[in-house]
Amino acid sequence: MKKQVRKKDEFQFNKERYYLMYKNIEKQTKLNLKDQVDYQPGQVVSKTLVQNEYVSMTIFSFDKGEEISTHAAGGDAMVTVLEGKGRFTVGGEVFFLEAGDTLIMPKDIPHAVYGEEQFKMQLVVSY
């Protein structure tokens, strides 16, 4: 089997694309993701940390009673609750998640998120 060799320029382009993908966050610093977004009365607040053609990572805060209405994503979505408690409806099934819990929401399946109380979550979508 013949080994595939990359051209130097192609490698440099890919290397830069992968290493320069974080934004809106301090690098080389110890931090806690839940501290990266604040609660706002009556709002859902988001802060995108990564966005490219392969993956997105966003931190959200939900005030109690706030929601993201039913929608579907173009990739598999993984949510991890960082603080508080939220309700997730995925394909008609309801899940209650609290700090430390993670849920995978499959691509193209309708889902919604509701703040049972104030809560924060990390969302990672892979395309």
Predicted regions and their residues:
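A short, N-terminal "cap"/entry segment at the start of jelly-roll beta-barrel domains
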Residues: 2-54, 89
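Conserved short histidine dyad/triad with adjacent acidic residue
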Residues: 42-43, 56-73
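A short, compositionally biased micro-patch
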Residues: 50-52, 63, 73, 81, ...
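Glycine- and acidic-residue-biased ligand/ion/polar-headgroup-sensing regions
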Residues: 75-87, 91
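A cytosolic small-molecule/anion-sensing beta-strand core signal
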Residues: 82-83, 98-99, 117
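Short acidic-glycine-tyrosine-enriched beta hairpin
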Residues: 92-107
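Ligand-binding loop in jelly-roll beta-barrel domains
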Residues: 107-127
